[in-house]
């Protein structure tokens, strides 16, 4: 049974796996296709158009990385001769990085201006009979490719982080009076971090990725869930939200939250998000981000309990720094949003954001397990049990 469901899910995802960067012809095509499928499920469908300009934000991030590269190289150079100044430079670097990497209302303001890129959020809704609760099932519909493959991006990010740590250690060793013979440490670490930051700053995006794992598999999973959840209690409003421009710093999620702010305040809302769901491997729950911040403690508890009862192995992970998912702006508005993903380090994961991210990388059995677990978690949410 699970295998049959999995085959159907992969086939559904395959029809949605084509290059569809925001604003492209593929983007318009997937918006039309998802609208038609939601209508076929008997939902009231709205296509909420919006436009945005990403260039100013990209310039800020690029120049911040380049400035940070220069600063960390300088700090590394000073680590042996002037460790105090080296440490001060690292403090400045960490503060600047923290300001940009930490989500905040002022940062969201950078994304609210209209611009040349036009896309849409696709929303399917089954209204509640009266005031009650709102359940949101969410997945982003856009895809993108990047000039650096995932292993290279991971390597550059790790190189930047470890390089900064290396500069701090080098300066600390000198301050402790044990720097003899280790003058190379700070310089080497600074150069490694600087080169890594320059590589990240030079990275560009394109429209070559079919987005199989990221995120056609998740679209198919949400459509399957919407079909299964036809019989919810009359006081539960079901919202299926396919966001645009997630790959462009979650602009679509922010626009939807802004547009529906008043109604979100009037009714308790919770969200299950699906991103990268369908890659072969264990089911993954993205539960935390930043410094100890939980995305959805109540939804997490319900889902973990359901997984335990079903015997479904899961792995809970923390969202890596500088990585964005639609759950972040939801959490910052006080809306619990638990993200389902899956996978392990392998071909399917390494192909994300490249032309190799095809539907053939999806694993039907994994997708079926995610659907079953999410459905069980929804029923626990409906019953109000942890």
Model-derived regions: residue spans:
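Second-shell loop/turn segments in exported
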Residues: 1-3, 17-25, 110-111, 151-152, ...
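N-terminal capping segment at the start of a domain
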Residues: 1-29, 41, 203-207, 276-279, ...
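N-terminal signal-anchor transmembrane helix
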Residues: 1-2, 24-27, 104-134, 207-211, ...
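Extracytoplasmic/secreted proteins, especially bacterial periplasmic and envelope-associated proteins
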Residues: 8-11, 29, 33, 224, ...
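A non-catalytic alpha/beta surface segment that caps or lines the substrate-entry region
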Residues: 12, 18-127, 148-187
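Alpha-helical metal-binding/catalytic segments enriched in His/Glu/Asp
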Residues: 38, 124, 137-138, 143, ...
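Metal-dependent peptidase/peptidase-like ectodomains
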Residues: 152-154, 233, 245-345, 349
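His/Asp/Glu-rich mid-to-C-terminal helical/loop segments that flank catalytic regions of hydrolases
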Residues: 345-386
């Amino acid at each position: 049974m699970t295998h049959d469901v999995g085959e159907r899910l992969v086939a559904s995802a395959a029809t949605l796996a084509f290059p569809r960067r925001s604003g492209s012809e593929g983007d318009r095509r997937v918006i039309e296709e998802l609208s038609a499928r939601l209508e076929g499920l008997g939902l009231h469908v709205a296509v909420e158009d919006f436009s945005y300009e990403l260039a100013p934000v990209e310039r800020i991030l690029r120049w911040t990385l380049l400035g940070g590269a220069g600063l960390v190289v300088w700090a590394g150079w000073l680590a042996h001769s002037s460790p105090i100044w080296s440490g001060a430079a690292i403090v400045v670097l960490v503060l600047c990085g923290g300001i940009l990497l930490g989500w905040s209302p002022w940062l969201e303001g950078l994304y609210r201006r209209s611009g040349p890129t036009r896309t849409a959020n696709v929303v399917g809704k089954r209204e509640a009979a009266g005031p009650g609760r709102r359940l949101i099932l969410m997945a982003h519909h856009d895809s993108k490719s990047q000039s650096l493959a995932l292993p290279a991006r991971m390597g550059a990010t790790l190189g930047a982080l470890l390089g900064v740590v290396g500069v701090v250690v080098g300066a600390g060793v000198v301050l402790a009076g044990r720097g003899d013979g280790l003058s190379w440490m700070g310089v080497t670490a600074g150069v490694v971090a600087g080169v890594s930051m320059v590589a990240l700053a030079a990275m560009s995006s394109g429209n070559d990725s079919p987005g199989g794992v990221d995120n056609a598999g998740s679209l198919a999973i949400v459509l399957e869930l919407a079909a299964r959840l036809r019989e919810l209690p009359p006081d539960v409003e079901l919202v299926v939200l396919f966001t645009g421009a997630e790959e462009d710093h979650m602009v679509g999620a922010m626009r939807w939250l802004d547009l529906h702010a008043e109604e979100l305040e009037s009714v308790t809302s919770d969200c299950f998000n699906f991103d990268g769901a369908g890659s072969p491997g264990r089911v993954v729950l993205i539960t935390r981000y930043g410094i100890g911040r939980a995305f959805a403690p109540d939804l997490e508890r319900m889902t973990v309990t359901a997984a335990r009862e079903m015997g479904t192995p899961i792995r809970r992970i923390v969202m890596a720094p500088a990585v964005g998912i639609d759950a972040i702006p939801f959490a910052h508005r006080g809306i619990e949003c638990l993200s389902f993903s899956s996978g392990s380090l392998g071909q399917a994961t390494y192909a994300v954001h490249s032309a190799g991210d095809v539907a053939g990388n999806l694993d039907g059995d994994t997708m079926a397990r995610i659907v079953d677990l999410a459905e069980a978690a929804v029923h626990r949410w409906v019953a109000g049990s942890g």
